[in-house]
Amino acid sequence: MSGTFSRCMCTPAARVFWNAGQVFCTRCLSARSLLSPELQDTDLGAVGLFYKPRDKLHWKVPIGIPQVECTPSGCCWLSAVFPLARMTSGNHNFLQRLVKVADVLYRDGCLAPRHLRELQVYERGCNWYPITGPVPGMGLFANSMHVSDQPFPGATHVLTNSPLPQQACRQPFCPFEEAHSSVYRWKKFVVFTDSSLNGRSRMMWTPESDDSAALEVLPPELERQVEILIRSFPAHHPVDLADWELTESPENGFSFNTSHSCGHLVQNPDVFDGKCWLSCFLGQSVEVRCHEEHLADAFGYQTKWGVHGKYLQRRLQVRGIRAVVDPDGPIHVEALSCPQSWIRHLTLDDDVTPGFVRLTSLRIVPNTEPTTSRIFRFGAHKWYGAAGKRARAKRAAKSEKDSAPTPKVALPVPTCGITTYSPPTDGSCGWHVLAAIMNRMINGDFTSPLTQYNRPEDDWASDYDLVQAIQCLRLPATVVRNRACPNAKYLIKLNGVHWEVEVRSGMAPRSLSRECVVGVCSEGCVAPPYPADGLPKRALEALASAYRLPSDCVSSGIADFLANPPPQEFWTLDKMLTSPSPERSGFSSLYKLLLEVVPQKCGATEGAFIYAVERMLKDCPSSKQAMALLAKIKVPSSKAPSVSLDECFPTDVLADFEPASQERPQSSGAAVVLCSPDAKEFEEAAPEEVQESGHKAVHSALLAEGPNNEQVQVVAGEQLKLGGCGLAVGNAHEGALVSAGLINLVGGNLSPSDPMKENMLNSREDEPLDLSQPAPASTTTLVREQTPDNPGSDAGALPVTVREFVPTGPILCHVEHCGTESGDSSSPLDLSDAQTLDQPLNLSLAAWPVRATASDPGWVHGRREPVFVKPRNAFSDGDSALQFGELSESSSVIEFDRTKDAPVVDAPVDLTTSNEALSVVDPFEFAELKRPRFSAQALIDRGGPLADVHAKIKNRVYEQCLQACEPGSRATPATREWLDKMWDRVDMKTWRCTSQFQAGRILASLKFLPDMIQDTPPPVPRKNRASDNAGLKQLVAQWDRKLSVTPPPKPVGPVLDQIVPPPTDIQQEDVTPSDGPPHAPDFPSRVSTGGSWKGLMLSGTRLAGSISQRLMTWVFLKFSPTSQLLCSHFSRRGALWLQVIGCLQVSFYLLSCSVVLTRYSDAFPYWVSFLVLCGVFVWVFLVLGWLLLYFYSRLHPTQSVLLVTTIRRSVMLSFWLLSSANFGNLCAALWSAPQASYVSFLASYSVGHVISGMFSYVYACLQIWPFLLFMWCPRGVVTSVGESV
C-alpha cells in the first residue's frame, strides 16, 4: 500500500493506522516515517512515535519506549482502522471513510461496541463469525481484549463482509468491551494486558500457537501476576486481579481453570459452592430443592462451575416453571469478567458481584402463565453456579511485585504398563474394587481382601456410590466414562454390569479433584502429587466394616467409621483380613479355604460361618491368637453323614446363630422401684440374695407424656430376666408398694399364689435406696399403653392400667442384678460414654457401629449391641398384645403393653412424671434410637395416612420371614430377635429416602427379601418337607383340606395370642407351635384351668368333627364322583346328604344292572337290555374321563394346574347332574312300584337313567373334549393355554 510518494509528506498531525505491521497515513496512504525526537510524544507510546496531535488527547498509552518496532502495544485498535474503512466503503468514498473511522477511534483511544454501531458496520454488510478455519478476504480478528487486521494467537472471532460458511453471531454481539491491549508471550501461553482510564489493568491468557514466536516477551514484573492468572482462571477471560482475594499458595485455593483443581483464589464455601443455580427453585418447597441438589450431584451434572445451562432449563421444565427476562426480576444473571464467558452466576443481590459483569435480570414463572416477557434461554454452552453469594466489599489486590515463587505442579508420568483386576461377581464387585486399590497401596497385593457378600441386583453399587466412597477414602482413582483422567493411577471401569479396575504401574499417584474422580475433567487437567498421608488410617478396615450395608449407605458408614473409629486393641475378622500383620497372609488364605469348604459340608450358609468366626474372634487381643483360633476350626470329613457347624468349631466357642449370648447364667432376681427425689425415704423391693451378690445401678427414668402413649425407659444393669425373678414398683408419694407378681408378668411363674416370692418382695420394702453404686451396664424396660380392638375381655386376661399424674420432680429408678460380673462380654449396652437427654444423641455408625453382616445385621464393634425396640401393632408368630411372657437373655427390650378401658386390678401401678425431668436427666440415661425421618419404621411410629401402608408391608416381611422358620420355633426369643433384625435390615433400605412416598415404592415388591433370608438364615430354618408324592396331589390335598376344615368359632373376647393371622398356605397343624416356651399367656381355659370339662368338650367336638369329615370325604372320593367344590358352596350338612344320596343311587343302579344281566329271560324286552347297556356305557365313559384327568394331573402337576382344576369341576358337575337325575328316577320308580310289575319297575328306572345319562353324556363330552385335545398337545401349548386361562 503506497500513495503518490514512497513516504508520507503530510503534517505530523495527520492520523496514522497500522496495516500488516507497517504505519500508514490516513490522508495519503503512504508509509509514515518516525518523527523527530522533539516531536515524539511519550504519553502515546507507539502512536507518539509517528503522530503529533494538535490538541492534547485525554487518553494515554501506558507502555513506554523502547519496544519492538511495528507492534502497536496498547493501541491494537490502530490496526482496525483500515479493515473497517475498506469493508464499509466503496471505491469512490474510501478515503473519506478512512478519515471518518480514524476520527471515531482516535476520540476515545480504543475500539468498543459503541464505535462499531456509530460507524454502522453491521448495516453495511459486516458480521461477526466464530473462527473455524482460514478467512479469505478482508477481516478484523478479535478476542475479548485484542483486535488485529491479521490472525493472531488467541483470536476467537472475525468481523468480515464476506459470506462465510459458518453461522454468523447474533446481533448485537461483540467479542470485546474495549480493545486496546498489549500482547506478550510467556512459556506456552499468550498473555494480553491493558489499562483502563482509572489505572486498573486487566489480564487475559490463551494457549500458544505457531505464530507466538513473533510476539514480545512478557516483562519480568508481570510474571507473578500471570502465574496467578493462568492457575486460577480459564482462558479468554479478561480478569482484574484486584477484584479477587488471593492466597500465596495454590494448594488450598480455588480455581476456575479447567486444568487445575486448586488455585490462588481464597477457598470460601459460601462463595465457591457452585449451587447458586438453586435460586431458580426458591419458589418451590425445601424437599424439591434438596431433591434437585441431590439429583445434580448423583448424576454428575454438578461441578465446581455449576450445572449445564441445558440441564437447568430441563429441570425447570420438569417442575412446570420457566425463566423470563424481567428488568425488575429478583434473580440477576452475571458472567465471569466478560459477557461472553461460559461461567455464569445467579444472584439475588442488587449490587454486581466483584469480578463479574451483569447481563440481565429474570424471574421464575409457571409454564402455564401467559406473559409478554421474553423467555430466557440458559444456553447450551453455559454453566451456572460460579459463586454462592456476593462478596460484600471488593477485595484488596495483593502486591503485584511479590516475587514468591509459585509451586510447580508436576506433569503426569507416562504409563509403563496396565494391570487389570476383576473382582468376584457376587454383587459387591464395586466395593471389592476399592478394597483391591487400598490393599495394593497398603500391602502391595492387588486383590480384594474382603469376603464375598452376595447382593441383590437392585443393591449393586452405582458410579455415584463409588465416587462418594472414593472421596471419603481419598483414593487416587477415577470412574472412567468416555475418557480417562490422565492423572488417575487407578481406573475403575464398568464392563457390562461388572466393575473392574486398572492400575498404571509406572505412574505416581496424584490427588484428584471431584471432577477427575467423577470422570468429567478436561483434557489438560493437572493434579498435585499424592501426599504421604493421603490414605486415611484404617481406611481398609473402614470399608470392610461398612461394605455389607446397603450400597447407598456405605459411604456414610465409612465416614462415620473414620470420624469415630472403634478401639484398635482387639483383632476382629475384618482387622485380620485388612490390617498389616505377619499372620495376615496365612490367615487370609486359611480363612478363604475354610469359607469355601466348611459351610458346604455342614449344610450351612456362608453368612452363618462368617458370623461364627466373628464370634470366635471376639475380644481377641493379638493376631497370633486369632490365627491360632482359626486353625482350631475342623474341616469335616467327607465320609461323615451329617456334621453341624458347632462340631467344626472349638468346644469353648460354638457357632451359635443367635446374636445374643446364651452362655451367661440367668439373673436370679431383679427389682425396679420408681420414686420421687423429694421423698425422705426411698422404697426398695428385691430378693435377699440380690443384696448379697448383685451389683446395683441407679438411673433416672423419664416419662414422655402423650394422649395414648407414655413411655418409661428404665436404664438398669444387665439384661433383665423376668422368669423366676421378682419385680416391684413403688410409689413414694403414696407410700404403697405394688408387686409385679399381681400382674402375672410371666404367665403364671410369678403368681399371687406363690407366697414365698411375695414374702421375699415384702421383706425388703422398708430399706432405703442406695445411690452410691455405679451403673456398669444397662437394659431398657419400655412401658407402653395400647387399646385393644375389642373392649371386652375374658375374665382370665389380666389387664394393666397405668394412671397418670404430674409429680414435682424427676423419678429415680433402682435396679439390682446378681449372678455375673459387670464386665461380662454379653452385656448389651455400654453406657460409659452415654449422653444426656437434652443433648442430641449421637446416631452415627461410629457411636452405634452396626455392621450388617451376612448372618447378623446387628453385630457391632466394641462389645456394644443396639437395642431394637419393636414398634407397636407389629407382632410376629406367637406375639401378643400383652407381652408379659418369659424372656430369655437374648432380649434387651421388655415391652409392657397397657390396655385401656379394662378393669383396674387391686393395686394399680402409678407412674409419676414431670416435664422438668428433661433438664436434670442422669448422664447414664439411654435414649431410644432415632431413625431417619422418612424411613419406613419412622413413618409407622409417626403415624399419618401412610402408616397403615408401611405397617402392612412390615407384616408381609414378618410373614415371609416366619415361613422360613421351623413352625415349632416361631415363638422363641431368638426367632423374635431375628425377625426384628431382619426388619431393621429391610428398613435400612429406606434410610436415604427424602420423601414419605419413596419408602413404599422401594419396599413394595420385596424381591430382595428371599435373598436376604438366605444370607441371614433364621436360628431354626424350616426343613425341606418335599416327598415323592409332591406335585398336584399335594396341592389339591392342601386345597381340599382348607375347604373341608371349618374355621374355629370367633371368641367373645379379644384374641391375645394371635394378632397377625397365619398365612393361608400354611397347613393347619403348622399354625400352633409344637415346642418352645409360649410367648404370651393364652386363654384361661388353656393356661389356668387346662383340663376343664369345657376344654375337653371343645377339643372332643373338634376331633370328632375332623374324623367324621375325613371319613366321609374318603368314602365319597372312593364311591361317588360328586365334586368337592360343592362343599364350599353348600353347608356341611347339605354336602353330606348329597354324598349319601350319590352312594345310594349308585348302589341301586348296580343292583338293577345285576338283575337284568343275571336273570335275563324273555320277560325282559330287548330294548330294556339295550337301555341298561347304554347306561353302563355312560358310567364307564365318565369314569374313564375321571381316570384320564387323574393320571394327567400326576404326569403334569405344574404345567396346567388351572386347566386341570377347571376340567375337574366340569366332570364332577356332570356326575352330580347324573346322580341327581337318577335319584329322581329311582324315587319315581319306587312310587309307582305297587302298581307296576317287577320288570316294568326295572325298565322304567333304566329308561330314566338312560335319558338322564344321555344328557350328562353330552354335557361331559363338551367338557372333556378340551381335556382330550390338550392331552395330545405339546407341553408348550398346554403351558401357554393354561397360563392364558
Curated annotation (Swiss-Prot):
- Map the zinc fingers (C4-type) to residue ranges: 8-28
Give the region (Disordered) as residue ranges: 752-797, 1050-1088
Q: Which residues form the Peptidase C31 domain?
A: 69-180
Q: Where are the transmembrane segments?
A: 1136-1156, 1170-1190, 1211-1231, 1250-1270
For region PCP1-alpha, the annotated ranges are: 69-182
Q: Could you name the Gene Ontology cellular component terms for this entry? A: host cell cytoplasm; host cell membrane; host cell nucleus; membrane
One Pfam family in the UniProt entry: Peptidase_C32
Q: Does the keyword Metal-binding apply?
A: yes
Report the GO molecular function annotations: cysteine-type endopeptidase activity; zinc ion binding
Superkingdom, taxonomy of origin: Viruses
Q: Where is the active site?
A: C76, H146, C276, H345
What GO biological process terms are annotated to this protein in UniProt?
Answer: proteolysis; viral protein processing; viral translational frameshifting
Alphabetically sorted, this entry's keywords are: Host cytoplasm, Host membrane, Host nucleus, Hydrolase, Membrane, Metal-binding, Protease, Thiol protease, Transmembrane, Transmembrane helix, Zinc, Zinc-finger
Q: What is its EC number?
A: 3.4.22.-
* The keyword Nucleotide-binding appears for this protein: no
Q: Compositional bias (Polar residues) spans?
A: 775-790
Residue ranges of region PCP1-beta? Answer: 269-384
Q: Which residues form the Peptidase C32 domain?
A: 269-385
Question: Which residue numbers mark the site Cleavage?
Answer: H180, S181, G385, A386
The identity of this protein, by name, is Replicase polyprotein 1TF
Origin organism is: Porcine reproductive and respiratory syndrome virus (strain Lelystad) (PRRSV)
